[in-house]
Amino acid sequence: MLNKRIGIDLGTANSLVWVAGQGLVMNEPTVVAVGTEDGRIVAVGNEAKEMLGRTPGNITASRPMRDGVIADYRVTEAMLKYFIQKVCGRIFLFKPEVMICVPAGVTQVERRAVLDATLSAGAKAAYLIDEPLAAAIGARLPIAAASGNMIIDIGGGSAEAAVICLGGVVVHKSVRVAGNKLDEAIIGYMKKKHNLLIGETTAEEAKIRIGSALVLDKPESMEIKGRDSITGLPRAIETSSTEITEAIRPVLLAIIGAAKGVLEETPPELASDIIDKGIIMSGGTSALRNFDRLMTELTGVPCHVAEDPLMCVVRGTGIAIENLDLYKKSIIKR
């Protein structure tokens, strides 16, 4: 097969690229650095992420995806072009077929924008798959079966809860609250409680290192550095896992609210399947310590984190593009 088939999980925080027959080939932050004067793309991915919050006046580093959908069309197109060129080389004779996953709750206009950006970036054919379906395929759930499966995919920009049966989404709810909002909650908490201004990267590091959805029996602590909001001078403080838990709790409750909303609307026959099988959690944010325990407590349904949760969506997208005939019911083509 001369033309490559590529699956892309274009996330708000990270973008992952899967090539049919090769597996995962790229995992880079969804960040693009743009020159403010001429609008040219300066850097993409890891290189641009290092520039977040540190750029000189003539460059801005921004995230082209907001809440799981395209916020800046031109920059998203440049990002897709960068991924396609990295996989196929700068000059390619055979245009690749590209599949992108999108949140199930996006509008037709937003879907069209993703398809157009993909074709403009150099794809021969563009396909879309709903994120919960891709996550379910990647988590190896039997999506074509006549029994219900429930998955909640919690990424950087949005959390998607869905019940899947017979290869389609039966009920879904999407909240534009996820990993990024956890970081924002930590930033807001530090400012309010300690008068300390910190950046996105610092907040994310605290969330990953000492964050927990439930209060830990043995609290952990770490040093956080930032700028004092009163004196304006650099300052470091010691923060504990208990503080991080307190800061992120409202966001976690909003995510769990989406799961509850789906359970309330699920047909009784499928609800009984879900009670037996439980809810599968995927996406980077589901790896937060004790999040599955908190969700089990609040929904009353056993929750399990999928194996390798960060990879579920991109693996599912890759499997779907490798087996287009098998999943044609679940895909939109352009």
Identify the residue ranges that each predicted region occupies.
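Nucleotide/phosphate-binding catalytic cleft detector across ATP-hydrolyzing
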Residues: 1-154, 162-280, 286-334
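Acidic, divalent-metal-coordinating active-site segment for phosphoryl/phosphodiester hydrolysis
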Residues: 159
